[in-house]
């Protein structure tokens, strides 16, 4: 047993877009970032007091990792442009060499998670062509990170931590 709260959404999931992406939002203390036209009603209701940021990418969480103090890393140029307009600190990286089985490549949000003040990474930034950019960004914002294995970045869809 955990003390983790959970909610049931109203969107009937399927393998088809946009239903498959209805829950793929990024939520911070202040923001809800998603393609708002497809966001599940439950998420909208839970985020009623947050600033809503609309992006064209339905797979927002797959493409974006939110870090403290309005810092973000994304593999989507459209998301980067929208966040820069609200004066967020955004690092864009190309996801061409992130592994996602059965797909051409993965996305940056799928191989990272932020929990308990630490950025957790599925793989090693040294094995990622744009890893040095991320290392410099993390150093600039003084953010610790843990690489979970010494190999290429692997898009596992994210990581979940239960307390």
Regions found by a protein language model. Name each.
Residues 1-163:
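The feature marks the mature, well-folded catalytic cores of soluble enzymes
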